[in-house]
């Protein structure tokens, strides 16, 4: 994906590392927004890639919206709605990516950065990471609906109404992230988890992520019924049969993604 300028994509085996690179603070510019959406859409349709690691270059994961660029892009009728549509589709591209997304939060993830993390599947934080909703300080509203998936009622409202940040250690204590590690250990830990996921049947992980997304907004009864229906579909795949044969034969399975 050499045609991208603010997003770098590097594939290693079945894992693709997607790195946001828009100095100095990886603000979500229109270019980075569109390139991140495009990169994830391409990865969704690339069979060789089974897992994504989403991270950022530099000391900041994403400082939020590019306010200067926002003003330049919103000048006439329809511009504001188009801007909002592009922004939300960027987050949906993460959540709806056919491949699981491991988010390696290397620094502050604020506003849009928090929404990106919340849209991912597995979150890992550096000791220098933090999540926050600073929009109240600039007369805007943040991604509170995304943050609701991570934080309790009181903590979310405190963050939204005061602009407070939650650091990596506290994120781990709250169970928001799977681990809080020294900066130099962040990518090794994220890649370790990604490679473990990549070793599983790509059919199961793809359909599993889709199912988790769908049942999140369902009742217990409807959600579990849907999960059972999806389990029946997965059970008919070649990968499911291979997994069962491998288990019986006490060997590692060889998955084909079918």
Task: Describe these PLM feature segments.
Residues 1-57, 92:
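Conserved CoA-thioester-binding segment of acyl-CoA-metabolizing enzymes
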Residues 1-13, 22, 47, 163-169, ...:
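C-terminal alpha-helix plus adjacent terminal tail
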Residues 8, 35, 56-90, 109, ...:
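Glycine- (often His-adjacent) and acidic-residue-rich active-site loop
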Residues 18, 36, 54, 66, ...:
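Terminal peptide-recognition signature
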Residues 39, 86-97:
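Catalytic-core regions built around general acid/base machinery
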Residues 92-205, 236-237, 241-245:
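Crotonase-fold acyl-CoA enzyme core
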């Amino acid at each position: 994906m050499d045609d991208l300028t603010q997003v770098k994509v590097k594939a290693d085996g079945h894992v693709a590392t997607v790195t946001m690179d828009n100095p100095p603070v990886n603000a979500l510019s229109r270019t980075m927004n569109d390139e991140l959406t495009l990169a994830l859409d391409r990865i969704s349709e690339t069979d060789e890639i089974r897992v994504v690691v989403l991270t950022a270059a530099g000391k900041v994961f994403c400082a939020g919206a590019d306010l200067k660029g926002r003003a330049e892009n919103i000048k006439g009728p329809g511009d504001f709605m188009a801007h909002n549509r592009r922004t939300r589709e960027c987050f949906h591209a993460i959540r709806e990516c056919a491949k699981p997304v491991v988010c390696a939060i290397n620094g502050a993830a604020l506003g849009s950065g928090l929404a990106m993390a919340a849209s991912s599947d597995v979150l890992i934080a550096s000791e220098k990471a933090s999540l926050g909703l600073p929009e109240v300080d600039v007369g805007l509203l943040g991604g509170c609906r995304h943050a609701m998936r991570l934080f309790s009622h009181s903590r979310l409202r405190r963050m939204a109404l005061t602009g407070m940040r939650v650091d990596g250690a506290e994120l781990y204590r709250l169970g928001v992230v799977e681990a809080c590690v020294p900066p130099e250990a962040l990518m090794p830990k994220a890649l370790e988890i990604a490679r473990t996921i990549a070793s599983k049947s790509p059919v199961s992980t793809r359909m599993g992520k889709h199912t988790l997304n769908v049942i999140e907004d369902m009742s217990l009864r409807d959600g579990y019924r849907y999960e059972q229906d999806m389990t029946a579909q997965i059970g008919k795949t070649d990968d499911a049969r291979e997994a069962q044969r491998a288990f019986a034969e006490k060997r590692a399975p060889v998955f084909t993604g079918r």
